[in-house]
């Protein structure tokens, strides 16, 4: 009697399958949105450099003000305008998404590289969020678009890699991941809610003047 072998751990369950189907589209479309936002931000940055009196199109009021953010040291965290990093990163993300949609099955090292890149993006975005809320005191609408796509890209890439066994994990970690996969959209909603509360709290004095 032939023993039945345990199936390899992959995203074949209903929840894992959803992650696997969503990720390529998220990379392609979310990356494209991020690329457009980063490009628009770079254009505004160049206009500000050419004309210090230029008012960016994304400067709406004292709080929603790209002009304020673009002229801070944080806007060039690594010695070059942050949008350049965004253009490079999102170009890679879009390419990966298109490759996956075409049916390619990249090797593990490829996925680990994507994981490292999205992790860097997520950490950098949260540093920028902190700087915007508590140091600069202004929000850049184009930057917020980048925030809104970077975190989901990191989140779904991480869930997919853990589910597929590409990242080191223990049985306990995998059980936790199974729960997170089941509530993948809920986690993102909680993150968005927490960010909304933080923004409301940071600029509460200004918001109340609009009532």
What spans do the regions from the language model cover?
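Secretory/periplasmic and organellar redox-cofactor proteins
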Residues: 1-211
């Amino acid at each position: 009697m032939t023993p039945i072998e345990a199936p390899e751990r992959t995203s074949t369950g209903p929840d894992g399958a959803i992650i696997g189907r969503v990720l390529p589209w998220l990379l392609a479309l979310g990356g494209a949105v991020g690329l457009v936002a980063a490009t628009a931000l770079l254009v505004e940055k160049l206009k500000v450099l050419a004309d210090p009196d230029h008012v960016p199109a994304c400067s709406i009021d004292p709080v929603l003000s790209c002009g304020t953010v673009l002229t801070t040291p944080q806007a060039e965290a690594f010695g070059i305008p942050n949008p350049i990093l965004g253009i490079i990163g999102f170009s890679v993300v879009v390419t990966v998404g298109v490759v996956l949609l075409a049916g390619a099955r990249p090797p593990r090292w490829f996925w680990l590289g994507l994981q490292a890149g999205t992790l860097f993006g997520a950490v950098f975005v949260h540093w920028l969020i902190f700087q915007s809320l508590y140091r600069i005191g202004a929000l850049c609408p184009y930057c917020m678009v980048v925030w809104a796509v970077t975190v989901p890209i990191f989140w779904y890439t991480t869930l997919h890699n853990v589910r597929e066994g590409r990242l080191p994990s223990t049985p306990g970690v995998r059980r936790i991941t199974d729960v997170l996969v089941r509530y993948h959209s809920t986690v993102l909603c909680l993150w968005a809610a927490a960010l909304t509360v933080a923004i409301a709290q940071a600029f509460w004095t200004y918001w109340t003047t609009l009532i």
